[in-house]
Structure formats: structure tokens, C-alpha cells
Amino acid sequence: MTQIDPSQLSVILSGPYLSHSGFSKTNRELAFRLSRKGVRVRADICESKVEVDTKTAEEVRRLSKTQVPPGTPIVYSMTMPSIISNDGPKILFTMMESSNGLHKEYCEKMDLASEVWVPTTHMSDLLSEAGVSSPVHIVPLGVDQEVFGPRSGQMGLPSTARSFRFLSVSWWGPRKGFDILIKAFVMEFFDSDDVCLVISSRDHGGKPASYIASEIEGIVKSTGKEDRAPIVLHSRITTDKELASLYNACNVFVLASRGEGYSLPIVEAASCGLPVISTRCTAQETYLDDSNAYLLDPEGFGKADPRDGRASSVGRWCKFYENQQFPVFSGKSVRRLGELMRESYEDRATAAAKAAILTEKVRTKMTWDHATDVFITRLAAVSAKQREKKQ
């Protein structure tokens, strides 16, 4: 195999950078690591909330001034750019959260790209089934195992937090399945149980923490149960180091998601050594199994309807979700999720054994360093192909 010299490579990495979204974190991690390896990286910063600290924002903006030669490949690392245009190769680095099927307009955009990069085989299978003509390659995401580890310290939590803590970290929205999780926790546990549920979440639209608190209260009241264990809401913006300390302050990570493109919170929690409870669907199914996690099976699949006014409907939250297949979780799923949480709470030896398997996998095979190396290998192949065309 020909040795790759990163200093001979250049790339325009386009997407959000300055928020705490998954794409923003991905772009920061890759841009910084590629640059440190010698790749000339120009950060094409798309508009987003500025949630990172001043130092990080300055580092990103410095990369936005990098000079790159004509014909440099552009990598759009986002759901989908409004315009796909470049004098060199055009690469879409994207992911979708549906279980089956992809939106027609989404696939049509794919066919405008020189290549499509996706983080898991779940997404590559969806593209293949949809008949996308552009070449598709796996370029994974990862975790910073130096930040997210079992020795990252423990965040102090409110006095209402009990000794045993379930944790869920994600944006607030129907796709993330907080309705399922909250109902399962409330119905399964009682005030006499030394347990609590910690929810670390913020609203995508910028609504205050009080909005999420009222949403949680509404879900709790819908169960009709009075004797219940406490729920603790953590909604302030945190750095990665603070987030790692939050993981380490808790005992089990739970994500009852209806669909993931990758799920950085799962791999970050696993890197910190937490047992994981999740859903058996979409991207997380490519690295979670019964040996390393507790998995909730869907009861079936249904089309996302943008006209569905239910709070749990994902159809109205993304243009590309319309009429695509997402898992169905109802009362049976709520009961089963509660059972899985109870199992991890009472049989801690089994939970620890599952966690050890997943932690080893994440910390050795699912790191940002590995993801960066794969990115460089693919970028080198694209650049070589471009040179051949010019000859």
C-alpha cells in the first residue's frame, strides 16, 4: 500500500462547528485532528448557535482562513447542503435516522455528489436499497477516549439525585424517545427505590429549561402514578470535560431513541464505562448487541406523517422524515424498557459485564483517531482519482 503523506492533502470541511450538535462536534474533532496531522483544512463554517467556549471558537475561525489550492475537495458534513457546488470533488458526509427507506429529495441530492460518506453500514444499506448512484464509503465517527474515560471525575448533582442514577443525554424532541423513557421509569420505580433518572437535554429551538421541565411533568402526569422515583433535569450547556464528569456521576446510560445516525452520546457513555440501554434499530444496532448492551426491540414500524399532531410524532421535525419508516414503541415497549432498567439496577454484575465488552470495543476501535485515519485514506483516494482525470 502506498504511504499517504497528509501534508500533500487539502480539504474544505463544510458544516456547523460552533454548537453542541452532533455534526458540529464531528466537524470540530475532524478538522482539528486532520490539521494536526498536516492536512490543509479550511473550515467552511455554516450558521449555527455559538455554544462552544471562546478558545474553541477562535480555533475554528482560524481554520476558516486556511488557504487551499484550486480543485480542493469539499466535504459537506451535515444533513444536506442547500447548494452543492465546487471546482473540485464534492463529497457528502451525512447520515439519516430512519429505519427503512430514504426521502426521494434526499436521494436526488446524493446523486449530485462525487462520493457519499456515511458513518455506519445501516446508512450505506439504506442508500444501496434506494438506488443512489454515487459511490458510497464508510467513514466512521468516534470518541475522544482521553476526555471520555472512567477517570474523568464526577459532576455534583442536586440533592434530589439518588445513589443509583440512570442518565439520558440528548436534544429534546420526539425522535429521542424521552416520552417512552420517562413513562418506563415512572411506571417501574417507586419512591422507596434508591434510584433517579437524570435527563441532560436542551431544546433545539432555544426554548428555556422550564419548557423541558413542563414537558417532563406532562409526561409524568399522563401515567397517573403518584408513588414514583425522582427525575432530575440538567439543561445547562457543558463542555466535553463536564459532560464526561456527568457520565461518571451516573450508573447506567439510557437512550430510548426512535432513530439515530450514529449516537455520539452512546459511545461517549460507553467510553466512560457505563452500561448502555438502547433501542434495537438504526445506526446504534451496528455496534450494539445483546452481549454488550440492553436492547429494546421495536413493536413494528410505521410511516412518519408530518400531519400527525402527536407530541411523539417525528414526521414534522425534519423534511426528510416525511413518510419514512420509524420504529413503533407503545405500551408494551414502555413495560419492557422498565424491565430492562430494573435488570440493570438489580443485577449489577451482569450490567458491568456488558459494559466492559462495549467499553473495550469503543475505546479501541471507535475513536476519533481511527475516524481521522479513515477520513485521510478516503481523501487521498479522492485526490488521486482527481489527479488521474487531469492527466
Located regions from the model:
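Extended catalytic core of nucleotide-activated donor transferases of GT-like folds
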Residues: 2, 12, 49-130, 242
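Conserved donor-binding/catalytic core segment of Leloir-type glycosyltransferases
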Residues: 12, 158-176, 182-185, 197-199, ...
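Acidic anion/phosphate-binding donor-loop and adjacent secondary structure
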Residues: 104-105, 143-161
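Nucleotide-activated donor-binding/catalytic signature segment of Leloir-type glycosyltransferases, i.e.
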Residues: 209-237, 241
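Aromatic "clamp/platform" in nucleotide-sugar-dependent glycosyltransferases that forms part
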Residues: 258
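Short hydrophobic beta-strand element within catalytic cores of glycosyltransferases
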Residues: 266, 275-278, 288, 294-295
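A short, well-ordered alpha-helix in the C-terminal region of glycosyltransferases
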Residues: 336, 342-343, 350-364
